[in-house]
């Protein structure tokens, strides 16, 4: 099954950082996101969604260091269902996001150290790469911000793979490609 969540929103509270017995960092953030729509009567409506997200490792520590209530972030991860019994024996449940990566969405700050973290944090805990056409112009501000911050690094070079020499090179003329 495919379980992937991408959400842009603002923090509803400061980052709550804890350390697990193993010494690894774990953080919880509250995220608010909204959707605007036109109602049947023609008036504009807004629907707000509040959800918690879990961050782990270095991503949790960086979030704690650079984010605060009101900060805008993009989170990629998976939807997780949590259930527990409270002290009265009542069963509770909720959905949360377990983050694989995080990206700051606020304007670049005057702090160069924060800017460096903003440029690199997205792929901290994720090996995923999206084959998006990030060079194509877009009118959607979300896509523009995502493309500029995540994929505008033209100077990055791929890490050499130990399998790189085992794949034969295929010499095909572009005229032969059917699409």
Curated annotation (Swiss-Prot):
One of its GO terms (biological process) is DNA repair. GO terms for molecular function: enzyme activator activity; single-stranded DNA binding. Keywords: DNA damage, DNA recombination, DNA repair, DNA replication, DNA-binding. Residues 1-106 form the SSB domain. PROSITE patterns: SSB. Pfam families: SSB (PF00436). This is Single-stranded DNA-binding protein. NCBIfam families: PRK08486.1, ssb. The keyword Transferase does not apply. Gene3D superfamilies: Nucleic acid-binding proteins. Transmembrane segments: none annotated. Plays an important role in DNA replication, recombination and repair. Binds to ssDNA and to an array of partner proteins to recruit them to their sites of action during DNA metabolism. GO terms for cellular component: nucleoid. Homotetramer.
